[in-house]
């Protein structure tokens, strides 16, 4: 059974940078916290906890003088301000692509634009982006949501960094159809687009797909969705222990990809587990 790994599976630049900052902070031996999970990988969060880097939900949980790391998804503007007011040492591990989306929203809002964010309203990245708007701001998950928005004379559009280009295009088209001045910033991460494109091609060339990543990871869930639309025999796992031999009955080629928050050691473990399966002995 041939196992084919997508070229760009695993950590993207922003996640690699965030985890590196977190592990460097852990090596100092000082009390270190992350505001929320540093990335959407329970296994990485657990490993950091074992090294003394503890996730907290609120700045008030950290004593004055402590170190707090801003997660890769970013945080709300008021949370960052609260950390500064509390005299904490702030290590900002916000992904540069997310930071750019925050900056665009702040600028557009000051220029009188109503903001439309394309994404998942409950995702921490989107909640952080929204907080930088000084005026009206709306989160839409699809072009159908645009129909429910009020009329706007000036619309500024940004996207959650893990959205697909097709999704952003559909929302922009729907906004343009309503009239008014529209300014769009493509804030989708290049790594997201590359991974999604690779996943489509790989899913079309194999008998079964395995997508590795946190079940709470938006970009991993999106990869699994994209693959499943092309290949129903697609399975989303977090770790190797979740692999089921029955998935590979009659399979000649297995495609493997992984979300941007998935560390290399987990990818290697999953591939080793799949490679050890003798498909001819599956009953």
Curated annotation (Swiss-Prot):
Its EC number is 1.17.7.4. Pathway: Isoprenoid biosynthesis; dimethylallyl diphosphate biosynthesis; dimethylallyl diphosphate from (2E)-4-hydroxy-3-methylbutenyl diphosphate: step 1/1; Isoprenoid biosynthesis; isopentenyl diphosphate biosynthesis via DXP pathway; isopentenyl diphosphate from 1-deoxy-D-xylulose 5-phosphate: step 6/6. The active site is at residue 125. It is an enzyme of class 1 (oxidoreductase). Binds 1 [4Fe-4S] cluster per subunit. GO terms for molecular function: 4 iron, 4 sulfur cluster binding; 4-hydroxy-3-methylbut-2-enyl diphosphate reductase activity; metal ion binding. Keywords: 4Fe-4S, Iron, Iron-sulfur, Isoprene biosynthesis, Metal-binding, Oxidoreductase. It catalyses: isopentenyl diphosphate + 2 oxidized [2Fe-2S]-[ferredoxin] + H2O = (2E)-4-hydroxy-3-methylbut-2-enyl diphosphate + 2 reduced [2Fe-2S]-[ferredoxin] + 2 H(+); dimethylallyl diphosphate + 2 oxidized [2Fe-2S]-[ferredoxin] + H2O = (2E)-4-hydroxy-3-methylbut-2-enyl diphosphate + 2 reduced [2Fe-2S]-[ferredoxin] + 2 H(+). Catalyzes the conversion of 1-hydroxy-2-methyl-2-(E)-butenyl 4-diphosphate (HMBPP) into a mixture of isopentenyl diphosphate (IPP) and dimethylallyl diphosphate (DMAPP). Acts in the terminal step of the DOXP/MEP pathway for isoprenoid precursor biosynthesis. This is 4-hydroxy-3-methylbut-2-enyl diphosphate reductase. It comes from Geobacter sp. (strain M21). The gene is ispH.
